[in-house]
Regions:
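Structured helix-beta-strand junction loops
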Residues: 21-22, 40, 97
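Generic structural signal for residues positioned in beta-strands
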Residues: 54, 76, 102, 121-123
Length: 138
């Protein structure tokens, strides 16, 4: 079951462990990094931190919304064995108080939902040796 967790109720160790178990662990979703770039961030948590999704919200003119914080290229669902269905379930679990969202999901979170715009993202895979990386360039 996916639940909304306020910042002060998030277990930082379990959160970070879920991020690190992801097929694409990213510093952008680590609790210490979020504390620096988006103080007061909240999150969605599946079961006992099996999967997690950071939520960075604000309020303007009485309207709550989600946004991508500065210095965070991607957010999305982090955990072990993330599927398209899990991503959709997380998106459905975003509290209704957020009337608008402009967030960048993980590059592996490819979903087809009306109103969701897919954008091109270019990443450099650093888990290869330097010669392999160089061979991809002219």
């Amino acid at each position: 079951m996916i639940r909304f967790a306020l910042n002060e109720n998030i277990d930082r160790d379990l959160w970070d462990a879920a991020v690190m178990q992801s097929s694409q662990p990213m510093v952008y979703a680590m609790s210490w990094y979020l504390d620096l770039v988006a103080p007061g961030w909240d999150g969605l948590v599946e079961d006992d931190y099996q999967s997690v999704m950071p939520l960075v919200g604000a309020k303007k003119f009485g309207i709550h919304y989600l946004f991508q914080p500065p210095f965070c290229q991607q957010h999305g669902v982090f955990g072990k064995g993330i599927s398209t269905d899990i991503v959709k379930n997380f998106l459905r679990a975003i509290p209704r108080k957020y009337r608008f969202a402009e967030i960048m999901l993980n590059e592996s979170d490819t979903i087809d939902i009306p109103g969701v715009e897919m954008l091109t993202n270019i990443t450099l895979q650093l888990d290869r040796d330097i010669e392999n990386i160089r061979s991809g360039y002219n």
